[in-house]
From Swiss-Prot:
Descriptive protein name: CDP-archaeol synthase
Disulfide bonds, paired cysteine numbers: none
Reactions the enzyme catalyzes: 2,3-bis-O-(geranylgeranyl)-sn-glycerol 1-phosphate + CTP + H(+) = CDP-2,3-bis-O-(geranylgeranyl)-sn-glycerol + diphosphate
Provenance organism: Methanospirillum hungatei JF-1 (strain ATCC 27890 / DSM 864 / NBRC 100397 / JF-1)
Source species taxonomy: Archaea, Methanobacteriati, Methanobacteriota, Stenosarchaea group, Methanomicrobia
Family membership noted in the UniProt record: Belongs to the CDP-archaeol synthase family.
Length: 166
């Protein structure tokens, strides 16, 4: 899941510049996504996800981590892209709900990227997904991700890397 976990962090670190929505508003007069979703951040986040996935694949192939499930390059790319697409879909709906950038949306903020990553991977690499993601593993991911997400965000907040701890 590292190719899905890292892109959001690296999107924030590498972001800035042109927003993906090009500053446009939806029919409700609110921004489609907002200034926090940028082209540079998307590219940086996906790149980081693919790089960590490549490192994982190397570690798996060379026998350094025999307990890791085998990854395919396709799955790594889909997990990384799906992670950021899930985050963008969440941002779209947050704007529709009137929740500003940085505003908290409990559990949705913690699971959006995982759901996006898993759904995109299921759609385009179903064989890998069905062979790798067992029901017990999915339950562990869905339970531990919010805790991990919150912990990492609190650390980022305390280090001054995030404006809010969620």
């Amino acid at each position: 899941m590292l190719p899905a976990y890292l892109p959001n962090n690296f999107a924030a670190l590498t972001g800035g510049g042109m927003p993906i929505d090009m500053g446009r508003n939806w029919t409700d007069g609110r921004r489609i996504l907002g200034d926090g979703k940028t082209i540079r951040g998307f590219v940086g986040g996906v790149t980081a996800g693919i790089l960590i996935g490549a490192v994982q694949m190397y570690a798996e192939i060379s026998g350094l981590v025999p307990w890791f499930p085998p990854h395919t390059l396709t799955a790594v790319i889909l997990l990384a892209i799906g992670s950021l697409l899930g985050d963008m879909v969440k941002s779209f709906f947050k704007r529709r709900q009137g929740i500003d950038r940085g505003g908290e949306w409990f559990l949705v903020d913690q699971l959006d990227f995982v759901v996006g990553a898993l759904l995109l991977t299921l759609l385009f690499d179903p064989i890998w997904m069905l062979n790798t993601m067992t029901i017990p593993l999915l339950i562990v991911i869905l339970v531990l991700t919010p805790l991990l997400h919150r912990t990492v965000n609190i650390i980022g907040y305390k280090l001054g890397l995030k404006k809010v701890p969620w």
